[in-house]
Amino acid sequence: MELSQLLNEIRANYEQLLTRNQIETVLSTRIQLEEDITKKMDKDGEALKAAQAELKEARRQCHHLQVEIESLHAVERGLENSLQASEQHYQMQLQDLESVIGRLERELQEVRRGIERQLREHEMLLNTKMRLEQEIATYRRLLEQEEIRYYGCIQGEKKEEKPTKSKVGFLLPSAIINEISFSTKVSQKYENENMETVTKQAVVNRDVKESAEAHGTIQTEKVDEVIKEWEGSFFKDNPRLRKKSVSLRFDLHLAATDEGCLESRQDNLPDIEVRLIMRRSCSIPSIKPPPGTN
């Protein structure tokens, strides 16, 4: 009785211990689970906060990027508009330049045609000038030949009448012809030989002109005598003139006559034309007459 009661008591205590242990185990397990859950919740909460902060930062960055993208789009649109405006502007300038180039090319062609036309006209004028110069030279040569033939015939006729006669005349400027007086002498030596020598000396305001010229046609064999006579007449007619203050130059050349005038004189020497030029020397002054003398 006592044993069964003891067993019952032991069984009851054991059951109580089991129940107590179970309860403690369950409680400890629950507490551990609650602690783990709490820790996990705390950790997850921190992670959630970090994720929320990251999300907020990402949203802020996304908004900033959106604003920047919009500004870039605006800049892009502005650049596109500026590009279109620049293209239109330069297209207009290009059209203007093309029109200017076309106009300048047309003007250049006109200038080239004008230059070619002027060159042709210049060539024509030059050819005309050359032809006119040739014609003028031809006419001048013909006139000189006719003049030489005419004077040759006249001189031939005079020489046939007075073959030993020589005439000399001075050529003076027309502007001072009214102020010039002449003195004339006839050489007795050549009068005896039937030869007349007319000497004219130019005197301006009682002084010999700076230059004077005489020419005449004489027989060839009388050249030396006539030249000496002419030279002496310059100083003989004006004693106040020194020979050192005057230089005399003699140019001799054959007188041109036509063939008809020379037919009758083939046996004689041809006449020559003598030209005497008197020039005052610049280094030696002449002696001027005292005032009041004639």
From Swiss-Prot:
Coiled coil: 1-151
PROSITE patterns listed in its UniProt record: IF_ROD_1 (PS00226), IF_ROD_2 (PS51842)
Keyword Coiled coil found: yes
Gene3D superfamilies named in the record: 1.20.5.170, Single helix bin
Cysteines engaged in disulfide bonds, as pairs: none
Gene Ontology CC terms: intermediate filament
Keywords assigned: Coiled coil, Intermediate filament, Keratin
Disulfide bond among keywords: no
Pfam entry (one): Filament
Gene Ontology molecular function, alphabetical: structural molecule activity
Domain IF rod: 1-150
Domain of life: Eukaryota
Protein name: Keratin-like protein KRT222
Organism per entry: Mus musculus (Mouse)
Taxonomic lineage from the root: Eukaryota, Metazoa, Chordata, Craniata, Vertebrata
